[in-house]
């Protein structure tokens, strides 16, 4: 049902892709530029009656009711991510791992022993996780497996976008063309998605195969904020990740199926400059010096910088592209509205 993670309509757990691959003896990896508890990475690893059940305690996105371990549930998404023991887990959302565990003990066959009163992160460390928090620490990791899984947490919330936020207007014709610039919050120690993907591939390679989920999460998040520059930068990160996978396949010669798609459509429109549209418009100067207008037209709430937000998902069909063994069985388009 809508808003749930890894459960059926009755709220009963159904196997996740990560669990299925792990049961077959494959190594598994889960990479996102979002909070690692966000919907796409969570669907790889967890079962939740509500997608917002990130933490076992605290004051934000706390699991409730039957989800809680003290009530016999599977626990928060953060706890379940640790219990899956994916070989590689990389993303944001460290603030939810800093929350306190309420119920100790063992909760599945992972072998983890939980200590109440300690944070989720400290419990992960106690159970053998290698925790990294920046690009240098990630690059230094030499191996990852179920005994020594890697947990990379690179921001308290979603990872910062590559390009600084652009502010739309109600009438693009009144706005001087802007140039997208680097986001100062995205530092040299913030790992790019392509680099995270390459490192995950390096650590996951083994004779039994692997399953790696990689998400460039912030094209969607920039779309919600009518942030044209943020959107462009994060689509660029997706392109880097795809290129990293293709390069790895070419260099290793491994028979590897690559599938690229999205969890739902969320699109902006490129219009002519000085266009008078019903949405929020940002005029940008392109690399060749021309003007490109980007329009966001699913909400009119973006009046100023403080009110950014409110743009909604769109109803387009989704492209599904694939290469490698089995690619012929992957459909070209799917309807995935929400």
Describe the predicted segments one by one.
Residues 1-51, 59-60, 217, 267:
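Mobile, glycine-rich extracellular loop/lid and propeptide segments
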Residues 37-338:
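A post-motif C-terminal structural segment
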């Amino acid at each position: 049902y809508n808003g749930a993670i890894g459960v059926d309509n009755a709220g009963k757990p159904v196997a996740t892709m990560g669990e299925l691959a792990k049961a077959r003896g494959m190594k598994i990896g889960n990479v996102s530029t979002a909070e690692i508890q966000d919907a796409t990475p969570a669907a790889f690893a967890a079962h939740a009656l509500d997608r917002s059940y990130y933490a076992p305690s605290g004051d934000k996105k706390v699991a409730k009711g039957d989800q809680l371990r003290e009530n016999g549930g599977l626990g928060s998404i953060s706890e379940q991510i640790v219990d899956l023991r994916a070989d590689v887990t990389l993303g944001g959302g460290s603030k939810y791992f800093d929350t306190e565990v309420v119920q100790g003990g063992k909760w599945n066959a992972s072998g983890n022993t939980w200590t109440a009163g300690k944070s989720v992160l400290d419990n992960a460390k106690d159970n053998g996780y290698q925790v990294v928090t920046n690009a240098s620490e990630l690059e230094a990791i030499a191996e990852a497996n179920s005994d020594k899984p890697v947990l990379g947490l690179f921001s308290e919330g979603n990872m910062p976008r590559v390009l600084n936020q652009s502010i739309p207007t109600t009438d693009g014709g009144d706005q001087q063309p802007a140039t997208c610039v680097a986001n100062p919050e995205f530092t040299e120690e913030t790992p790019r998605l392509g680099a995270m993907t390459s490192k995950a591939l390096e650590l996951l390679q083994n004779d039994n195969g692997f399953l790696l989920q990689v998400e460039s999460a912030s094209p969607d998040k920039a779309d919600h904020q009518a942030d044209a520059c943020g959107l462009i930068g994060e689509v660029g990160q997706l392109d880097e990740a795809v290129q990293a996978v293709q390069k790895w396949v070419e260099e290793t010669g491994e028979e590897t199926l690559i599938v690229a798609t999205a969890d739902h459509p969320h699109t902006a429109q490129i219009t002519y400059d000085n266009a008078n549209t019903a949405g929020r418009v940002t005029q940008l100067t392109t690399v060749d010096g021309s003007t490109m207008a980007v329009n966001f037209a699913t909400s009119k709430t973006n009046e100023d910088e403080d009110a950014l937000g409110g743009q909604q998902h769109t109803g387009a069909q989704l492209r599904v592209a694939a290469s490698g063994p089995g690619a012929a069985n992957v459909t070209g388009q799917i309807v995935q509205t929400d």
